[in-house]
Structure formats: structure tokens, C-alpha cells
């Protein structure tokens, strides 16, 4: 067996990021062959990933990546097991690499990412293989939980990540004056992250769900001894409150509590003689 030098161990560690003892063992097991040692560590990572497949991975980070022209964007959640790993350079760099790949390839789901090849920084491994390698390197389960992709050639896509990278949102807007919408789009992304709407407008709330909620409110009012003639008004009031909570355009605008989001959008349309519609949005909170 060839003698393993400290320089060889350091070189392998620089290439793979694995621990010194793991690198020494890999070189010992492969007779000092650097490429075989790299493969050995990757296989070890895959084996560890299999062992940790059932582990809970609720820490991690939310990442948003936008095209330079803000016509496309990606929001994703990458999970690990501890906040310590989530804040490390290896994990944050890997998250950034995934978001860049997803954006460049216009990937619409986490599952569609798995067979795609990463760049030279990850030796061209597929995303699936690279996650296993990262699991071996960091000693924790690494999992791409979810991903959302927006493409809006007739408008803009904008995103927001709350400090700490545990909460984020992405929104797409259709407009005939995209050059004017940048700040408004950023405000909307922040609104979505902070206020957690579910739909853009009332039409997005299923009618059967509203009917069910109305019946629940009606029964609650009757059980509280409210008079029959007042029940309908009570139900209507509670439904209005529900809409204000879950419908984006009905929410109070976070930058001006005297305005609803719908009024803020109307002001922009009138001031700029522009068309403007919120097409869709996605909000991720870590560990949901």
C-alpha cells in the first residue's frame, strides 16, 4: 500500500470538503488513488444518505433567484437537520447553485431537478447525487423539498426573502409597463411573505368552501344566542373578515394601513396609465 502524505489528505479535503479523518481513510482504502478516493467518499455519502432517509429535516433555507430582466424567477426550499448546517457556507452555496440551475433550465418542480447536472463546482453530478454527496459531507439529511418557477414575458417576476432565509415569496405580474413595476412588485412580494394570503382575489376561493364556512359561522351565531334576524349580518361580517385575511387584494397594504392592496394597485394603474394584474404567487415558510 502506498504511503499517504499529509499533502494528499489536504488535497482530497480541498476537493471534497470531507473531514480529515474521512479523507485519510478514503486514501488508505484506495491505495492513495485520488479519483478512487473521491468516488469512495461519494459512495459513503450515498450510504449515509440512505441511512438518514427517514430523518426529519425541517431546518434549511428559502432561496429566490430572478433573471436579470425579471421575466423569470425561482423560489425553492432546501432542507437540512440543524440551523448550524443551514448557516454554513457549504449549504448556502449549494442552495444558490440549485436555484441558478433551476432558473437556467426553467425547472417547474423539485422532482424535475433531480436528474439535472450541476456545474464543475460539483463535478457535474446530478442534483440527486450531489444531495447524497452533501449528506455525506455535512453529516445531515439534505433534501430539496419544493420549488416554484414563474415565467412572465408580458410582465415581471419579483421575489422577497425575509432576513434569516426562513421565509420567502415570489409573485408574477402582467403589465404593459414592466419598466415601472419593479418597486411595486417588490412590495407585493414582501406583502405576501408577511401577510400570508392564499389567493389573489375572491374568485380564487372555492364556492363550496365559502358555503361551508358560512354555515359554520351561522351555527356559531345561533349557539351564542344571537337573534335569527341578525344572523345573516353576522355571517356576512365574518366572511368579510375571512376575505381580508386570505385574499391578497383585500388585505391592508403593509406600507400604508389606510389602503387595501386593491386600492394600491388601482392607484398605480391610474397614475401610470398602465395595465396591471397579479397573475400568481407562492409563499414558502421553512418547515411547513
From Swiss-Prot:
Region of interest called Involved in Mg(2+) ion dislocation from EF-Tu, as start-end residue ranges on this chain: 82-85
Listed Pfam families: EF_TS
Record flagged with keyword Cytoplasm: yes
Entry's Gene Ontology molecular function annotations: translation elongation factor activity
UniProtKB keywords: Cytoplasm, Elongation factor, Protein biosynthesis
Gene Ontology cellular component terms for the protein in this record: cytoplasm
InterPro entries assigned: EF-Ts_dimer_sf, Transl_elong_EFTs/EF1B, Transl_elong_EFTs/EF1B_dimer, Transl_elong_Ts_CS, UBA-like_sf
Localisation per UniProt entry: Cytoplasm
Main subcellular location of this protein, as a coarse class: cytoplasm
Family: Belongs to the EF-Ts family.
Job description of the protein: Associates with the EF-Tu.GDP complex and induces the exchange of GDP to GTP. It remains bound to the aminoacyl-tRNA.EF-Tu.GTP complex up to the GTP hydrolysis stage on the ribosome.
Name of the protein in its database record: Elongation factor Ts
Encoding gene (name): tsf
Amino acid at each position: 500500500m502506498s504511503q499517504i502524505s499529509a499533502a494528499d489528505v489536504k488535497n482530497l479535503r480541498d476537493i471534497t470538503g470531507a473531514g480529515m479523518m474521512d479523507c485519510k481513510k478514503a486514501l488508505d482504502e484506495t491505495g492513495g488513488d485520488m479519483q478512487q478516493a473521491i468516488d469512495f467518499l461519494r459512495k459513503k455519502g450515498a450510504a449515509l444518505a440512505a441511512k438518514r432517509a427517514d430523518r426529519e429535516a425541517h431546518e434549511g433555507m428559502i432561496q429566490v433567484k430572478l433573471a436579470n430582466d425579471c421575466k423569470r424567477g425561482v423560489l425553492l426550499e432546501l432542507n437540512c437537520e440543524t440551523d448550524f448546517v443551514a448557516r454554513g457556507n457549504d449549504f448556502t452555496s449549494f442552495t444558490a447553485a440549485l436555484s441558478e440551475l433551476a432558473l437556467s433550465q426553467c425547472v417547474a418542480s423539485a422532482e424535475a431537478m433531480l436528474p439535472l447536472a450541476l456545474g464543475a463546482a460539483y463535478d457535474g453530478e446530478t442534483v440527486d447525487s450531489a444531495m447524497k454527496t452533501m449528506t455525506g459531507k455535512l453529516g445531515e439529511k439534505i433534501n430539496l423539498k419544493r420549488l416554484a418557477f414563474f415565467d412572465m414575458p408580458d410582465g415581471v417576476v419579483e421575489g422577497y426573502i425575509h432576513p434569516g432565509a426562513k421565509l420567502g415569496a415570489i409573485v408574477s405580474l402582467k403589465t404593459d409597463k414592466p419598466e415601472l413595476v419593479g418597486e411595486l412588485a417588490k412590495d407585493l412580494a414582501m406583502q405576501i411573505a408577511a401577510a400570508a394570503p392564499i389567493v389573489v382575489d375572491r374568485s380564487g376561493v372555492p364556492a363550496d368552501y365559502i358555503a361551508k364556512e358560512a354555515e359554520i359561522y351561522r351555527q356559531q351565531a345561533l349557539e351564542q344566542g344571537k337573534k335569527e334576524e341578525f344572523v345573516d349580518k353576522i355571517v356576512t361580517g365574518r366572511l368579510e373578515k375571512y376575505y381580508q385575511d386570505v385574499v391578497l387584494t383585500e388585505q391592508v397594504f403593509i406600507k400604508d394601513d389606510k389602503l387595501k392592496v386593491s386600492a394600491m394597485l388601482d392607484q398605480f394603474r391610474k397614475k401610470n396609465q398602465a395595465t396591471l394584474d397579479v397573475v400568481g404567487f407562492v409563499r414558502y415558510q421553512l418547515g411547513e
